[in-house]
Regions:
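Predominantly five- to eight-bladed beta-propeller fold
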Residues: 72-73, 160-209, 254, 307-310, ...
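Short loop/turn segments that connect beta-strands within beta-propeller blades
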Residues: 79-83, 127-131, 210-214, 260-265, ...
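Conserved beta-propeller blade repeats
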Residues: 42-58, 92-110, 133, 138-155, ...
């Protein structure tokens, strides 16, 4: 069974299964233009989880409350045919990670629910026979994740050790004293991570909660981080991912391990399943419990440029085999099919994200869902049916159901927001870079686009660098197109989806082939008659901002630039961001290989910038620290280049507060309108 979205007309989604150029023709030609407020009104769909009786799919909806300047997540369920939708959790608290008990009686989820503002995340249960959610766990520091045992009587919990501050606060409370703040005491090689305080020795371990006697038993120990835990189908063991080398902070050598879930032994020695020196992750058991499929990186020296392959090993350990080496595309989220004859997975390929399937008997790979789309998370029922997330150029993520050779859209979460909007037409393009390399991309044209007219054009660059623009809904590009811009996006070298060599072309070579590729995208848009060469803008976030910095230090063709959460002076990031291991592998140590660090740093050509540049970032960003933006701003301001620095308080690498997200979109439009549109 193979379903290609390019040839299929979905039930419940009329005409959206046509090629991308035809999809655009189905848009509302008399609608209104998209605004930042519309983007905030869009709801994010998460999940799915299929009920054991196959009748319902649980999922989450994240909704923004503009007035409260916050967002919340609720759990819903939708019938398999999409006709009935039921909200399961109330709007007064956020809930996530819904999981059905295997016996079908309960739906578990995680929520920090309670009258106390400091309530910790716990597992709560909804009884399918009715009633309010009831708290199931009570862990002082809260839980990070959970999974039902196959017999529904136990629950695997991921719990992080209490921090020094939490222990001190407890001690003060017991003594009837007020807790005093403690200094951060750091002794780890890797001591930063975006979105969290300084890293200490608190580690996440595996516990099992037994509902019969309400006991909590710890299964894994030590100065190691454990994650991605999953039950063996007979409930006797748990597979998990952990880096248990002598110094986990100095490498990315995570392996698959298995620990017994039976008996009363206080300390258990996990069994090592994989021995690959690279990262092994995402373990999943075969239904007979004899094998474990997982994701492996076989060339760890290439860090994030290496391809993620599908692999399999004996559950007893050994017999490790890489299954998709010849495919040369990134694989994720493996799941055995019910008959154990195949493995499903998510497959990234050339601006598309497909549902792939590997036949364990023949080695053949097919794609049950493919085409001009981007799938997200998926879940499989014991019948073989699959529920999955899909996004399209004019469709933010919704849930679809694949059963009986029929792919059906079962949620329409954002129809009300989208129905009267006139969105940009999106065209898939391919062009040659300066050295003849073929590069793929997309062009978004304004809803009132007229062929023959040359439009002001914005080059938007994706983050990563190892990621890709795909056929999913692109909020930034749609918003700018609604303002009258042609928007050009591309997947330059360094991007994923085109093979390891394409990604690794950027290794220690930032700002060289990728610069040529994005400039070729602009030249293509000009040559095809879309773009006015005298009204060009450029911008991006994260690596998109970094490549923007290369662009403005190498060319004066752009009238305005926006660089968000970017780096500019690389050597200043040593010991400051959370990429210390990756920096060292790619560029060496700065006191030993100073030239390598300086060679690719935009800082070395910062005196050549003449483009008016808006600089943005989050104050608490430890992924790409705000000091980079501050240094860039300082240079531009000192040199008399028109610039502005916008810093969002209490924000890390991604901007989450709704008012800040709207502010960022508004500033994008205002800056480009002034410098590119000429208003």
């Amino acid at each position: 069974m193979m379903i290609d979205i390019r040839r299929l007309a979905f039930s419940a989604l009329v005409c959206i299964a046509l090629p991308i150029t035809a999809v655009s023709e189905e848009q509302n030609d008399s609608g209104r233009l998209l605004t930042a407020d519309d983007l905030l009104a869009l709801k994010s769909v998460g999940g799915p989880e299929i009920s054991p009786d196959r009748e319902w799919i649980a999922y989450t909806i994240d909704t923004i409350d503009v007035e409260a300047d916050d967002s919340s997540t609720q759990i819903y369920m939708v019938s398999r045919d999409g006709k009935d939708v039921v909200q399961l959790t109330s709007d007064d608290y956020s809930a996530n990670s819904p999981k059905w008990s295997p016996d079908g009686r309960y739906l578990g989820f995680i929520a920090a629910k309670g009258e106390d503002d400091d309530a910790k995340s716990q597992v709560w249960l909804l009884d399918r026979r009715g009633g309010d959610a009831k708290q199931y766990t009570s862990v002082d520091q809260g839980i990070r994740g959970f999974d039902w045992s196959p017999d529904s009587k136990k629950m695997l919990l991921m719990i992080t050790d209490k921090s020094a501050a939490e222990l001190a606060e407890e001690a003060a409370e017991e003594a009837g004293e007020e807790a005093k703040p403690l200094p951060y005491v750091i002794d780890r090689l890797q001591f930063k991570q975006d979105g969290v305080p300084y890293l200490d020795r608190s580690r996440t371990h595996i516990y099992v909660w037994n509902s019969d006697d309400e006991s909590l038993q710890q299964l894994t120990f030590g100065d190691y981080e454990d994650g991605q835990a999953t039950w063996r189908p007979d409930g006797s063991e748990i597979a998990f991912t952990s880096n248990r080398t002598d110094e986990p902070d100095s490498n990315e050598n995570s392996d698959i391990w298995v620990v017994s879930a039976e008996g009363d032994a206080p300390v258990r020695d996990p069994r090592r399943i994989t021995s690959n020196p690279g990262s092994d992750s995402s373990p999943t058991w075969s239904n007979d419990g004899r094998r474990i499929a997982y994701i492996t990186v076989t060339e760890p020296e290439l860090i994030w440029y290496a391809t993620n392959h599908l692999a399999i090993a004996s559950a007893a350990g050994g017999d490790e085999r890489v299954l998709t080496a010849a495919l040369d595309r990134n694989i994720s989220a493996p799941l055995f099919t019910p008959d154990d004859q195949s493995i499903l997975f998510s497959l990234e390929d050339s601006a598309e994200q497909h549902l792939g399937r590997y036949d364990l008997n023949t080695g053949a790979i097919d794609r049950p869902v493919e085409g001009n789309l981007s799938i997200g998370r998926f879940a499989q029922h014991s019948s073989g049916d699959v529920a999955l997330q899909i996004s399209l150029p004019h469709l933010p993520t919704e849930l679809f159901y694949l059963g009986s050779d029929q792919l059906t859209q079962i949620t329409k979460t954002n129809d009300e927001t989208l129905h009267d909007l006139d969105l940009a037409e999106v065209r898939n393009i391919a062009f040659k870079s300066a050295d003849g390399t073929t590069v793929e991309g997309f062009i978004f044209t304004p809803p009132d686009y007229r062929k023959g007219r040359k439009y002001p054009t914005i080059l938007r660059i994706h983050g990563g660098p190892v990621s890709q623009f795909d056929f999913s809904f692109n909020a930034d590009a749609q918003l700018l197109a609604a303002q009258g811009y042609v928007v050009v996006i591309s997947n330059p070298r360094g991007s994923s989806g085109y093979g390891q060599d394409f990604s690794a072309a950027l290794f220690a070579n930032w700002g060289v082939p990728d610069f040529e590729d994005v400039m070729a995208a602009v030249d293509y848009a000009i040559a095809e008659g879309y773009s006015d060469p005298d009204r060009l803008g450029v911008g991006g976030w994260s690596y998109g901002g970094i490549l923007t910095n290369y662009v403005i230090t190498k060319t004066d063709r752009f009238e305005g630039a926006i660089t968000g959460a970017s780096e500019v002076n690389y050597i200043a990031n040593y010991g400051h961001d959370h990429y210390q291991l990756q920096w060292e592998k790619e560029l060496g140590l700065p006191w030993e290989d100073k030239e390598a660090w300086e060679k690719i740093s935009p800082w070395e050509n910062i005196d050549k910038v003449v483009t008016p540049t808006l600089v943005m970032g989050g104050k608490e960003d430890w992924n790409v620290p705000i000091q980079n933006s501050e240094q860039l701003y300082q240079v531009l301001k000192r040199r008399g280049i028109e610039t502005q620095l916008v810093v969002y308080p209490e924000e890390s690498h991604g901007i989450s507060r709704p008012s800040f997200r709207k502010d960022r979109w508004d500033r994008y439009v205002a800056w480009y309108d002034k410098h590119v549109m000429g208003q």
